Amino acid sequence: MSGSSMYKTKLCILFNKTGDCSRPNCTFAHGNAELRRPGESSFTGRRHNMDSDLRDRRHNMDSDLRDRLGRQFSPERRPSLDRSGRRVQRFSGHDNSMPFENRRDKDYRENRRFDERRDYAGGLKVGNRIEDRAEDGRNKFHGYNNVLEEQLKDVEMDVKMLTDDKLRLEASVERKAHEVDILTSRIQELETQLDREKDECRRITSSSKKFVKEYNRFLRAQDDLKRSEARLQKLGNQLSTYLAGSEGNNRDVGLDIVSDEETNGRNLRTACDPHNELQNTSSLSRKKHYVDQYTTKEPVEDGLIGRGEEEKVENEKKRPPCWNMLSSKSYSEEESGAWNDEDTINRSSSKEDNWKRRRFSIGTSATDKVILSTSMAAREFDDVAESEEENPEAANGSPLISLPPPPPFRDAHVQRDEDDVNGDVMEQKKAYDDDSV
C-alpha cells in the first residue's frame, strides 16, 4: 500500500545496465513506463480519493446507520424478551434472500477495508484526510530515503568494485614493472655477453690470420730448405767427383809450366843432391796444394740453377779444365819432344825449379826485381808450405784438404774470368823464363 503511493522518479541502475533487476521490492522505475512525475502522481491520488467517496455514499444509502457507523466496537444486538420469556423478533423491513449473518459478515469486511484509510464518522472525515495526507507524506519521504539508501548502496558497491579493480590493476602494473626490470637486466647481460663474444671472435680471427700467414711462411721455408738440401747434395757430389778426377790433372798443370831448358839442365843436379830432392818433394806437395786452392775450376752449376741455363751447366761439365786447355795449347810442341819418361822428368824439373826460385827470391832485393801478382801468391804459398815442413806432425794430423769457400755467383762473366786466368798463367811462364835467364 505504501509502495503504490511512492513516486518512482529515478531509473534503476541495475535494470539499465543488465536489463533485469533481481530485487523483488525495487523502488526504482524499470523503464520510462514506470517513471512517474509528482503532478501525475497527485492527480492520480486525488482521483482515487474521489472514487472512494462515491462508492461510500452509494453504500451508505442502502445500509443502516448502525451499519454505516461500523460495529466492530459495538456490542452484539440481542432481541428483547416478552413477558413469557421468549425472544421477540422485531421487524427489520422486507425479508431478504441473504441470511442476516452473511450480510453482516459482508458489511463487516467492507467496512473494515474502508476504515483502514478513513473514519466514516461525519465529524472525523476532514481530520482523517489530513492525517492520511501526512501519513502519505511520511511514506513518500520514507520511500525517498529508501531510494537514496538503495542508490547509496549501489554507489558503494560500484566504488568497492572499482577499488578492487584498481588494486588488481596496481598489482598487475607492479608485476609488469618487475618483469620489465628483469627483462632489462637480461638484455643488458646479453649485450655484455655479445660484446665479449665479438671481442673473442675478432681475437680468434686475427689469430687465425696470423696462424695462416705463419703456416704459409713455414711451407715456403720448408720448400726452400728442401731445395737447399738438394742443391747442397748436388754440390757435394759434384765437388767429390771433381776432386777425385782432378788429382791426376794437377800434376800435369804444374809440369807444363816449366820450360824445356830448365828441365834438361837440372836433371843431373837433382839426381845427385839428396837435400835438393827432399826440398823438391816438399815443393811438389806445395804446388799441388796451391793448384788445388787457386786453380781448381769452380762449378758454375750453382749460379745457373734456377735461371733456366741447364745447357750451360752441361757444357761446363763437358768442357775440359782451363789449365789443361792452356797446357795443351802452349806446350803441344814440347810434348812432341824426345822424352820417353815424361812424368819422371817433369816431376824432377818441377822440384828443381821451385828450389831455384826460392833461392833466387832470397838473394834478390825488392828494388832490383818486380814481383808479379801470381809470383806473390806463390811466395805466400811457399811460406805456408815451409811452416808445414817445420811441423810435419800437424801436417800429418789433417790428411784431408780443407775445402775452398763457397764459390761466388758466376754468370756471363765466367768466360772473361777464365781468360784473365789464362793471361796470368802466361805471365807466370814469362817470369819463369826470366828467372832462368
From Swiss-Prot:
Q: At what positions is Phosphoserine found?
A: S259
Q: Which domain of life is it from?
A: Eukaryota
Q: Does the record carry rRNA processing as a key word?
A: no
Pfam families, per the entry: zf-CCCH (PF00642)
Keywords, alphabetical: Coiled coil, DNA-binding, Metal-binding, Phosphoprotein, Zinc, Zinc-finger
Q: Cite the GO molecular-function annotations of the record.
A: DNA binding; zinc ion binding
Has the keyword Lipid metabolism been applied to this entry? no
- Location of region: Disordered: 35-107, 266-360, 380-437
| UniProt name for this protein | Zinc finger CCCH domain-containing protein 40
